[in-house]
């Protein structure tokens, strides 16, 4: 990343050399956490001796893991933050002690040498845009259970829908970009699937595309998350935009652009969470604007219903202490109606009226928000409870 010492980020040779010559693991580590107090390392899996390794992967305990992965030095990156970009690597996790690569996919034009394809994009050569994957591939239904679609955010390239029917050869079948895309930021950072049942018909087949702000103090065009209708996976459509958070009335600034640090969305609540999801409620970390909670029951007009802005520490003359903003992550416990956030100054546990009365006592997780992750979790609950029909009891984990 750009710093006062290296203001041009990867375009400063000294910083770039440090990054590309890193000697540590580029890949993933798998652990057995049967005993959470003593995790046991099963394997260190290298995705390549060059490139970025992995960053923000998707794995729900099934056969396959979807890695946000840079496996070599041929995946181009315009933005100053990294020397190379990432794409998708799918690996077989059947034996977590012996991971096997299944396939790779990247946007045509993303690799050096694919110049004709790359030059079709307006941002080619701008040294600003994020030209790669950032949040791996979200696969709402496991391939081994009959699922065949994955949704991935590829920065300035947009969101791609991949057909995984032949998982050894993923194929793009759908694509969407925001029509007012601008230089900078990560327009499509991650893609979050809304978990909606028949009681919430307007939210079925909906995805939320999150962007990530990159530059402090709004030194780039502001982006906002998008509600995306994927009923037709070959023709995904942006149908709604999230409102821009406003500064609290008692804040010493009237706009978050003046609050120091990054202003914009980053990571959202986790897809897999304790309890039964409340599909109309969505929470996301917003850097210097804290955590924001939205009512998305009308997907064409998401509405903010709550926020929490934690203290933002840092010295005004110490760029490294404030440039990222503060709030990076959030996690919702639907069974206890709690929101956890991770910030650079510490972690917070929050309640929110939109979720309901908080439960502060520890409790065992009876069920998870994603149906297929409950199989094997509780042997006393029939499979039909999660999947309908007259299915048998889940096999033990």
Question: Which residues make up each language-model segment?
Answer:
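Feature marking well-ordered beta-strand scaffolds used for ligand recognition
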Residues: 1-397
């Amino acid at each position: 990343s750009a710093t006062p010492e290296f203001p041009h980020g990867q375009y400063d040779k000294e910083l770039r050399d440090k990054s590309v010559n890193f000697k540590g693991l580029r890949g993933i580590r798998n652990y057995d956490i049967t005993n959470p107090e003593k995790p046991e390392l099963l394997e260190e899996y290298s995705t390549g001796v060059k490139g970025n390794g992995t960053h923000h992967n998707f794995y729900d305990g099934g056969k396959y893991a979807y890695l946000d992965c840079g496996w070599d030095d041929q995946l181009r990156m315009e933005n100053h933050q990294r020397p190379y970009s990432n794409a998708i690597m799918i690996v077989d996790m059947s034996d977590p002690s012996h991971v096997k690569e299944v396939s790779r996919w990247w946007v045509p034009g993303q690799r050096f040498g694919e110049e004709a394809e790359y030059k079709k994009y307006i941002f080619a050569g701008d040294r600003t845009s994020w030209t790669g994957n950032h949040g791996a591939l979200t696969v709402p239904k496991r391939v081994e259970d009959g699922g065949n679609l994955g949704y991935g955010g590829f920065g300035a390239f947009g969101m791609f829908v991949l057909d995984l029917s032949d998982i050894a050869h993923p194929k793009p079948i759908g694509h969407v970009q925001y029509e007012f895309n601008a230089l900078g930021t990560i327009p499509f950072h991650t893609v979050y699937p809304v978990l909606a049942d028949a009681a919430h018909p307007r939210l079925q087949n909906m995805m939320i595309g999150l962007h990530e702000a990159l530059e402090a103090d709004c030194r780039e065009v502001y982006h906002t998350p998008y509600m995306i209708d994927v009923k037709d996976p070959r023709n995904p459509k942006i149908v709604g935009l999230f409102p821009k958070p406003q500064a609290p009335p008692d804040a010493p600034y009237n706009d978050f652009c003046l609050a120091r640090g990054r202003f914009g969305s980053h990571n959202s609540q986790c897809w897999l969470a304790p309890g039964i999801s409340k599909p109309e409620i969505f929470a996301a970390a917003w850097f210097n604007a804290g955590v924001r909670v939205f009512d998305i029951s009308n997907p064409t007009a998401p509405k903010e219903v709550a926020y929490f802005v934690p203290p933002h520490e840092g010295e005004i003359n110490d760029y490294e202490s404030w440039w990222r903003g503060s709030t990076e992550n959030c996690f919702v416990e639907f069974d206890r109606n709690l929101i956890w956030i991770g910030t650079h100054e510490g972690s917070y546990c929050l309640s929110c009226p939109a979720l309901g009365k908080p439960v502060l006592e520890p409790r065992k997780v009876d069920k998870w928000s994603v149906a297929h992750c409950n199989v094997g979790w509780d042997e006393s609950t029939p499979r039909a409870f999660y999947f309908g029909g007259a299915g048998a009891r889940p096999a033990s984990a």
